[in-house]
Amino acid sequence: MRKGTVKEVLAKIKYDPRENENDYYLIIEHRGDYGNVKKIPVNLIELGHGYFFVGETQIPYHRILKVVRKDGRVIWESRKIRK
């Protein structure tokens, strides 16, 4: 698992030419409902300061539970899950 904040991990995936953003997706807590999760491909997001965007929808970084590679390897995981 990579170290750093989720924003740092996503920036590396999106902007490092050695990475392919199509190989990753996010698992987010959808609408704050515990257990209601949504999968979002990283290539569909734009990074912001305290939020990321999917189209015009603004989602706070703290709702990201995991960053996962297509092969199922978890790259980053929220402390909420690690407890």
Curated annotation (Swiss-Prot):
Pfam (any one): MJ1316
Protein name: UPF0248 protein PH1212.1
The organism of origin for this protein: Pyrococcus horikoshii (strain ATCC 700860 / DSM 12428 / JCM 9974 / NBRC 100139 / OT-3)
Family: Belongs to the UPF0248 family.
